[in-house]
Regions:
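Hydrophobic aliphatic residues
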Residues: 17, 128, 203, 226-229, ...
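A short glycine-rich beta-alpha junction/loop motif
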Residues: 25-27, 33, 102-110, 138-166, ...
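Short beta-strand/loop turn elements enriched in aromatics
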Residues: 32-53, 234-252
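Non-catalytic DNA-recognition/assembly elements of restriction-modification systems
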Residues: 1-23, 211-232, 352
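Amphipathic alpha-helical segments with low aromatic content
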Residues: 1-9, 156-157, 162-218, 344-347, ...
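A short beta-sheet element
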Residues: 40-42, 51, 57-129, 250-252, ...
């Protein structure tokens, strides 16, 4: 930042922090209410960012009677390191903020620490999640299926910081404001998606109309309105990643941010789907997901069904109708590996408006999707900017 030209200083972790007590409570010993809050390592790894505001009402509480005795409760500026994970996210750190008298314990698989001398609020939370710091931890991690890092090894790392609190404050405040902006952007996206879910229900249950003179919607079975193409898997010898042949859509992994993407091709296609068809994931963890095909022509695997509208229904209306039906369809999924069968799709009872109203409905939801995508792109930009700044602001 302009006006700061002092060199940064570096100290051993062991000279910067003292270690604090943690508990070993499992999730089963936590609840939504209680007198003492608990910071679980799983939440540090996945749920929380670099800074945890203690006013966050999603922080779990310790069930009464399970609290630690003689515990030195955490304070503003304390950090909590997750010492165990399934991958190299070991070492993910949060800094606590706005404790204001709340009783907080550090939980299972965490290393709580207290600075021995002052730092700017939030500086340590951001610094300890930079690649500059985290790369020190990677060679110190131990384990095969599960990775962990010991207090002794954490103590070997170096903590770098500007010499002046003022420069630390500039860095942490700037990143915090950027995080707040990204959080607000996420809430906008969530609100738009919630609105879309409500609008889909209102439209397809005929609670609202897009026609000046509402007309009766006709009752059909889905099988009266579409042709349904099931997929077929290939052995590895029948596909390639050299872009030779026809794109091969293998499953939910081919859906990225609401778009179809291709990473495999085949020279022996048999089960075709075409641009504009609605694809329904019918097997596996992504079962029930719906996407519109953007490639000209593809072969689909068993994980997909392709729905192609006939002359009674527009392809865009088919896409949004299938999206509305997906939860209902998924509830009928069966088998050890969750699966949707053809009969479930074809036998869905649906109501269909005239073609001109179908087009109005599809245009409305298309504009809504465009708005959601624009806000998602804005969030991606904010996240990318933050990532770049995290690399450039710290040395």
């Amino acid at each position: 930042f302009p006006g700061f030209d002092e060199p940064w200083c570096s100290h051993k972790f062991s000279s910067v922090f003292s270690f604090l007590q943690n508990n070993t409570l499992s999730r089963a010993e936590l609840d939504a209410t209680g007198d003492v809050l608990d910071i679980h390592y799983g939440d540090v790894l996945i749920k929380y960012g670099s800074i945890l505001d203690a006013t966050d009402n999603t922080i779990p509480h310790i069930i009464s009677g399970h609290e630690s005795t003689n515990y030195d409760y955490l304070q503003d500026g304390d950090i909590i390191v997750a010492d165990t994970a399934e991958d190299e996210t070991v070492g993910k750190t949060i800094e606590l903020l706005n404790i204001s008298g709340r009783k907080i314990e550090a939980g299972l698989h965490t290393v709580p620490c207290r600075p021995l001398f002052p730092f700017a609020s939030m500086y340590l939370g951001y610094y300890m999640n930079t690649s500059h710091y985290h790369k020190q931890l990677i060679p110190l991690m131990q384990g095969i299926k599960v990775l962990s890092i010991s207090k002794g090894n954490i103590s070997k790392t170096e903590i770098s910081s500007p010499q002046t609190i003022a420069e630390q404050e500039k860095i942490s405040r700037f990143l915090y404001l950027l995080d707040q902006r990204a959080t607000a952007q996420s809430k906008i996206i969530d609100a738009l998606k919630k609105y879309k879910r409500g609008a889909l229900k209102a439209v397809f249950t005929q609670q609202v109309s897009f026609s000046a003179k509402p007309q009766k919607w006709d009752k059909y079975k889905m099988g009266d309105l579409i042709s349904l193409q099931s997929g077929q898997d290939f052995a590895p010898a029948e596909y390639n990643d050299q872009e030779i042949g026809v794109p091969y859509m293998t499953g939910a992994s081919c859906i990225v941010k609401g778009e179809t993407v291709v990473s495999r091709w085949t020279q022996t296609p048999r089960c075709y789907a075409y641009k504009g068809d609605t694809l329904l994931v019918c097997k596996g963890s992504g079962s029930g997901a719906v996407v519109r095909l953007t490639q000209e022509k593809v072969h689909i695997a068993r994980q997909f069904m392709s729905l192609r509208a006939n002359e009674k229904m527009t392809s865009d209306f088919c896409y949004y109708l299938t999206g509305f039906l997906s939860d209902r369809i998924k509830r009928n999924a069966t088998g050890l590996i969750e699966g949707i069968d053809r009969g479930t799709v074809l036998n869905q009872t649906v109501f269909l408006p005239p073609l001109h109203e179908q087009k109005k409905i599809a245009r409305f939801f298309s504009k809504l999707d465009f708005t959601i995508t624009a806000h998602e792109n804005m969030l991606d930009t904010l996240i990318n900017e933050r990532t770049g700044l995290m690399q450039r602001l710290f040395i």
